[in-house]
Amino acid sequence: MIKNLLLYLLIFSCGNIIGQTKPLSEEAEISLLTCSPGEAIYELFGHTAIRVKDPRQGLDLVFNYGIFDFDTPNFVVKFIRGKLLYKLGIDQYRRFEYQYVAQNRRVVEQVFNFNLNEKQTVFNYLLYNAKPKNAYYQYDFFYDNCSSRVFDILIDTLGQNLTFDIPEKNYLSYRQQLDYYIDGNTYPKSPWADFGMDLILGMPADEIADFEGETYLPDLLSQNFTFGILRNSDGLVQSNSVIVPQKKTSNIVNFRITPLLLFWTLCGLTSFLFFVKNNTFTKSLDFILFLFLGLSGVLFTFMWMGTDHEVCYKNLNILWMSPFHILLAINILRDNINDFWKKYLGFTLVVNVLLILFWTILPQDFHAAAFPIILLICMRIVALIKKTE
């Protein structure tokens, strides 16, 4: 009862704030909050929010572009197809802070070096866009998310008053940036998440993310804001501090099976099947292999052609995970490898061999664990062709 009452009061108070433009005092501060990654898959790259604090007015709010409504009709379908709308939400800072303390996730605050007019302009912009008719937007992982939106807000509100001393460096592709984070360079490794993302992301992920493009990652947005210049002289960031520290946890990593270890092991074991005469065993293995590849191909084809997820378009992984492998698997189970399927096997073998030969110059970076899988496919195709001769 008390919890529901507090929630109602929070919603009511935030609703009152949205409905009116409050003049900020000279003591007001607007800052960027950069949150470290969490354990859930959707928390792997951290989070970004904007804090508006004005002690004289009794304001301490967090504006968050990472909100979506689980009660949305057909939520799961819309989420999968990339049609789910995200929105800008407002919360009291204390509630926001409590959440990250409970999850043991660090929060870094960068206070912007705004004058009063700039503070008011940004605050008014946020309030206007938090209104129900303006709050929703079409989320895009690379090009329009909770982090990149903050960059856009400052560009839109400050105009020519904000410039950047863009550093000269070798910019990475979107995929390389994701790999850098997931591979444990900054946070604990997530090898299976890394493998899954490399499989589902298409060629757009291999485009170079420039200074503005890389702001889709909260840490890089925070870093790039340090190169901001206000009114041709002052730095954009006035101060930088950790407001929610992260407690140290054990760095001991227990042995675990990674995609690379698993698939190289399977590839090695499969090589011995050339000497196995048990037709039932090898037939079952080939059926499972090509059925799994085919079903994966159906998923990736759907993500490319049936959704609005642009990052999944033009996925070359379909070359070795063809949806047609499902039909091949069925015919393997039926012992029906006729002339058509022999030609299909030959064509598939050529495609997979070419992928291996041109691995380093393909327009899409494949995950290293895909190499032993493709090698395994080649071995089983050769075995199938030999068996049908």
Q: What does each model-found stretch correspond to?
A:
Residues 1-21, 388-389:
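Bacterial Sec-dependent N-terminal signal peptides
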Residues 20-25, 32, 134-136:
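Internal catalytic domains of large membrane-associated glycosyltransferases
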Residues 21, 54-59, 113-118:
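A short, structured loop/turn motif at beta-sheet edges
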Residues 21-24, 41, 250:
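Alpha-helical membrane-anchoring segments
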Residues 26-104:
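Glycine-rich catalytic cores of cysteine/serine-nucleophile enzymes that process amide/ester linkages
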Residues 38-39, 105-113, 132-141:
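Second-shell loop/turn segments in exported
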Residues 117-126:
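Short, charged, amphipathic alpha-helices and their helix-cap/turn boundaries
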Residues 128-325, 329-330, 337-341, 349-389:
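Activation targets extended, charge/polar-rich intrinsically disordered C-terminal tails
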